[in-house]
């Protein structure tokens, strides 16, 4: 099993760029930078894309330019065009159930109320069996405050922790292609930014 498409979820536009909900895009932006593969807008895939080599694999990067709840449109367009199966996709997204400074890989599962994941599952024919990179952003403590929280900007102290976790996640994603998922997962899951 190899990953052929790495997606970073986000809302488009400058007003959302620094919000917690865009943590997935921060990850893909960093990966593109590390691999010197700038993202370019590609209308037919409804997003910013790039092509990279990881290990010996040809991998596409994607940050949808749709709103979060329509992310599946971009993912399905790219998956269909390049004949990529759900289990060959890694979707990076913000995760309320993990604290800032932590990131974890996961295969399959529900959407946990995340509208981006919900739409991707739906557009992939109700198939949830894609890989996820869950980037911890913490939880406001009250479910009624979640929308304002994910669309808010983290304070500097939390941003630093999130950035460190994303940095480690980028290293571990590269490691996945050279040393395998088990090693990459063990390393990432042992990490906690201080």
Swiss-Prot record:
<keyword id="KW-0378">Hydrolase</keyword>
<comment type="similarity">
    <text>Belongs to the PTH family.</text>
</comment>
<protein>
    <recommendedName>
        <fullName>Peptidyl-tRNA hydrolase</fullName>
        <ecNumber>3.1.1.29</ecNumber>
    </recommendedName>
</protein>
<dbReference type="GO" id="GO:0005737">
    <property type="term" value="C:cytoplasm"/>
</dbReference>
<feature type="binding site">
    <location>
        <position position="67"/>
    </location>
    <ligand>
        <name>tRNA</name>
    </ligand>
</feature>
<keyword id="KW-0963">Cytoplasm</keyword>
<comment type="function">
    <text>Hydrolyzes ribosome-free peptidyl-tRNAs (with 1 or more amino acids incorporated), which drop off the ribosome during protein synthesis, or as a result of ribosome stalling.</text>
</comment>
<feature type="binding site">
    <location>
        <position position="69"/>
    </location>
    <ligand>
        <name>tRNA</name>
    </ligand>
</feature>
<dbReference type="GO" id="GO:0072344">
    <property type="term" value="P:rescue of stalled ribosome"/>
</dbReference>
<dbReference type="GO" id="GO:0006515">
    <property type="term" value="P:protein quality control for misfolded or incompletely synthesized proteins"/>
</dbReference>
<feature type="site" description="Discriminates between blocked and unblocked aminoacyl-tRNA">
    <location>
        <position position="11"/>
    </location>
</feature>
<dbReference type="GO" id="GO:0004045">
    <property type="term" value="F:peptidyl-tRNA hydrolase activity"/>
</dbReference>
<comment type="function">
    <text>Catalyzes the release of premature peptidyl moieties from peptidyl-tRNA molecules trapped in stalled 50S ribosomal subunits, and thus maintains levels of free tRNAs and 50S ribosomes.</text>
</comment>
<feature type="binding site">
    <location>
        <position position="16"/>
    </location>
    <ligand>
        <name>tRNA</name>
    </ligand>
</feature>
<dbReference type="Pfam" id="PF01195">
    <property type="entry name" value="Pept_tRNA_hydro"/>
</dbReference>
<dbReference type="GO" id="GO:0000049">
    <property type="term" value="F:tRNA binding"/>
</dbReference>
<feature type="site" description="Stabilizes the basic form of H active site to accept a proton">
    <location>
        <position position="94"/>
    </location>
</feature>
<dbReference type="InterPro" id="IPR018171">
    <property type="entry name" value="Pept_tRNA_hydro_CS"/>
</dbReference>
<feature type="active site" description="Proton acceptor">
    <location>
        <position position="21"/>
    </location>
</feature>
<feature type="binding site">
    <location>
        <position position="115"/>
    </location>
    <ligand>
        <name>tRNA</name>
    </ligand>
</feature>
<comment type="subunit">
    <text>Monomer.</text>
</comment>
<keyword id="KW-0694">RNA-binding</keyword>
<keyword id="KW-0820">tRNA-binding</keyword>
<dbReference type="InterPro" id="IPR001328">
    <property type="entry name" value="Pept_tRNA_hydro"/>
</dbReference>
<dbReference type="InterPro" id="IPR036416">
    <property type="entry name" value="Pept_tRNA_hydro_sf"/>
</dbReference>
């Amino acid at each position: 099993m190899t990953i052929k498409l790495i997606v970073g979820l986000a809302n488009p536009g400058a007003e959302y760029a620094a919000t917690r909900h865009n943590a997935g895009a921060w990850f893909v932006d960093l990966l593109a930078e590390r691999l010197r593969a700038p993202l370019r807008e590609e209308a037919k895939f409804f997003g910013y894309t790039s092509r990279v080599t990881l290990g010996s694999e040809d991998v596409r990067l994607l940050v949808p330019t749709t709103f979060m709840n329509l992310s599946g449109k971009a993912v399905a367009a790219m998956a269909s065009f390049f004949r990529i199966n759900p289990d060959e996709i890694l979707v990076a997204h913000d995760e309320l159930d993990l604290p800032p400074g932590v990131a974890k890989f996961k295969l399959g599962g529900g959407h946990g109320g995340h509208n981006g994941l919900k739409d991707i599952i739906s557009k992939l024919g109700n198939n949830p069996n894609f890989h996820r990179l869950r980037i911890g952003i913490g939880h406001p403590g009250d479910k009624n405050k979640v929308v304002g929280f994910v669309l808010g900007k983290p304070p500097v102290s939390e941003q630093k922790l999130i950035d460190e976790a994303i940095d480690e996640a980028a290293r571990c994603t590269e490691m996945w292609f050279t040393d395998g998922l088990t090693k990459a997962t063990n390393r990432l899951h042992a990490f906690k930014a201080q």
